[in-house]
Amino acid sequence: DEEARQLSKEYSLVKAAKVIRDMGPKILIIKKGEHGALLFHGQEVFFAPALPLEEVFDPTGAGDTFAGGFVAHLAKTKDYSFNNMKSAIIVGSALASFCVEKFGTQRLTEINEADIKERIQSFVQLVNFDIELV
């Protein structure tokens, strides 16, 4: 998020996103490290929190892991819609959450597809709720 603020000269990330998108990109992701990520497209905004972890050993490589998971999901599905990008952010965030559990990317060599699916479900449970206004 600091890069977005520096590039746009705006402190508000919503304003920063508008300034940056006025420079050309139609879609913008602003990563907020341990606080999640924001996806901007047109008038739509999606926020994905980071998974709350008790132990964060080392954030080295987490941003690259997030990007790799995001792009891999888009490449695998060949669906570049806003809705699928929301899913891609969750996939990237899930993979990044593994990365911080050990030094560098070591933890990524220890996980399998079932671990990834379970972590993604943790994200779904974190943000999925029903609300009924009274």
Regions found by a protein language model. Name each.
Residues E2-R5, I116:
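A generic structural signal for short hydrophobic patches within well-formed alpha-helices
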Residues D1-E2, G33:
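Anionic group-transfer/hydrolysis microenvironments
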Residues K9-V134:
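Conserved phosphate-binding/catalytic region of the ribokinase-like
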